[in-house]
């Protein structure tokens, strides 16, 4: 019994250490970014911008009803600081793709120069046996129809390989979470390539209290700019048309 208690204590300590290991910047990539939510709370965006940060993904919505409490403020502040911004939706298996797409569209108005919308999908459907791919695909299609741009799929590598290697997903940009492997970038089969890599979840920047996720873009600045949203005509009034 004492052995089991000691073993459990060591496991707890190791997990805590692994989750708080400081993420070092990967400066060999030309385009650098972070992703945030209400957990980051107060941010000095001018200080962040002075540290060679180019883009910021911010959580906008989750499921069919939840909006991140700081999304409106962050969305405006990122723009004012001269950084490229992107909004992501955390997908829930407990409401329909249609409801979730409508919620995102009502919340996020893209402007020229923003990153495409992101679908964060990393949990199974509610019966734990069905793949989320069909619901995710429906969300992606509805969002693409509304904004006229290919959304980005965010997930971790194992989940992507299990659910999103089908032909129907091949044209969507990929944002992969893969930590603690600075010399081992994400692997995407069938000749596909990741667009963004979230390589750590405990980075530190002046202007942000505590940890923040670090990300990089796979290529050069010219390729990055080609990915950015170009239309300026989208607004939430088109929700019913898209759905």
Residue ranges and their predicted role:
Residues 9-16:
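Bacterial N-terminal signal peptides
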Residues 20-62:
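Boundary/entry segment of secreted carbohydrate-active catalytic domains
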Residues 25-33, 169-243:
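Functionally critical loop-and-helix segments that line ligand-binding/catalytic clefts
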Residues 33-35, 54-59, 85-89, 115-121, ...:
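Structural recognition of the beta-strand scaffold that forms the well-ordered cores
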Residues 34-44, 60-71, 90-99, 125-130, ...:
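Acidic-and-aromatic substrate-binding clefts and catalytic sites of carbohydrate-active enzymes
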Residues 45-52, 71-82, 104-113, 188-190:
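Acidic (Asp/Glu)-rich catalytic clusters
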Residues 48, 78, 119, 143, ...:
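Conserved, mostly hydrophobic/aromatic
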Residues 116-190:
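Catalytic domains of cell-wall/extracellular-matrix polysaccharide-remodeling enzymes
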């Amino acid at each position: 019994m004492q052995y089991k208690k000691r073993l459990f204590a060591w496991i707890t300590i190791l997990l805590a250490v692994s989750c708080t290991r400081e993420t070092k910047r990967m400066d060999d990539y030309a385009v650098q970014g972070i992703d945030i939510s209400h957990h980051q709370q107060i941010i000095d965006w001018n200080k962040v911008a002075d540290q060679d940060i180019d883009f910021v993904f911010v959580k906008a919505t989750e499921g069919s009803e939840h909006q991140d409490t700081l999304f409106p403020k962050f969305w405006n502040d990122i723009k004012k600081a001269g950084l490229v911004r992107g909004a992501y939706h955390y997908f829930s298996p407990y409401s329909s793709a249609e409801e979730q797409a409508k919620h995102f569209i009502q919340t996020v108005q893209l402007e020229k120069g923003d990153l495409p919308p992101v679908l964060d999908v990393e949990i199974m459907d509610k019966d734990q046996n069905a793949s989320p791919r069909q619901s995710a695909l429906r969300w992606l299609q509805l969002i693409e129809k509304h904004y006229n741009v290919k959304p980005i799929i965010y997930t971790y590598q194992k989940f992507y390989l299990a659910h999103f290697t089908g032909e129907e997903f091949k044209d969507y940009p990929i944002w992969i979470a893969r930590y603690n492997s600075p010399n081992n970038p994400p692997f995407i089969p069938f000749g596909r390539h990741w667009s963004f890599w979230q390589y750590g979840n405990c980075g530190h920047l002046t202007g942000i209290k505590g940890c923040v996720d670090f990300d990089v873009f796979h290529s050069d600045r010219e390729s990055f700019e080609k990915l950015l949203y170009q239309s300026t005509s989208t607004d939430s009034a088109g929700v019913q048309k898209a759905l």
